[in-house]
Amino acid sequence: MKLTCVMIVAVLFLTTWTFVTADDSRYGLKNLFPKARHEMKNPEASKLNKRDECYPPGTFCGIKPGLCCSAICLSFVCISFDF
């Protein structure tokens, strides 16, 4: 019974926290569609086409293997295989 009450309070707290910290999305779709139409007319304006520079082999890649040009990060260093 005690565990059930604790779980209910935790769920209510997390639910209210989500609503309090969420962005105001009332006008989200209103601003989204004109931007999408502009990106269809000008594909260069799309943020999805922009990619950060990739790291060459032998450089430190940390814990993000997607930053390597070869997409292989082994022991925190970008590596490449030449076939």
UniProtKB/Swiss-Prot annotation:
Residues in the signal sequence: 1-22
One Gene Ontology CC term in the entry: extracellular region
S-S pairs: 54-69, 61-73, 68-78
Keywords assigned: Cleavage on pair of basic residues, Disulfide bond, Hydroxylation, Ion channel impairing toxin, Knottin, Neurotoxin, Presynaptic neurotoxin, Secreted, Signal, Toxin, Voltage-gated sodium channel impairing toxin
Organism superkingdom: Eukaryota
Tissue expression profile of the protein: Expressed by the venom duct.
Gene Ontology MF terms: sodium channel inhibitor activity; toxin activity
Residues excised as propeptide: 23-49
Keyword flag Transmembrane helix: no
InterPro entries: Conotoxin, Conotoxin_d-typ_CS, Conotoxin_omega-typ_CS
Presence of the UniProt keyword Acetylation in the record: no
Subcellular localization: Secreted
PTM sites of type 4-hydroxyproline: 56, 65
Family stated for the protein in its record: Belongs to the conotoxin O1 superfamily.
Free-text domain note: The presence of a 'disulfide through disulfide knot' structurally defines this protein as a knottin. The cysteine framework is VI/VII (C-C-CC-C-C).
Task of the protein: Delta-conotoxins bind to site 6 of voltage-gated sodium channels (Nav) and inhibit the inactivation process.
Protein's name according to its UniProt entry: Delta-conotoxin-like MVIC
Organism: Conus magus
Record lineage: Eukaryota, Metazoa, Spiralia, Lophotrochozoa, Mollusca
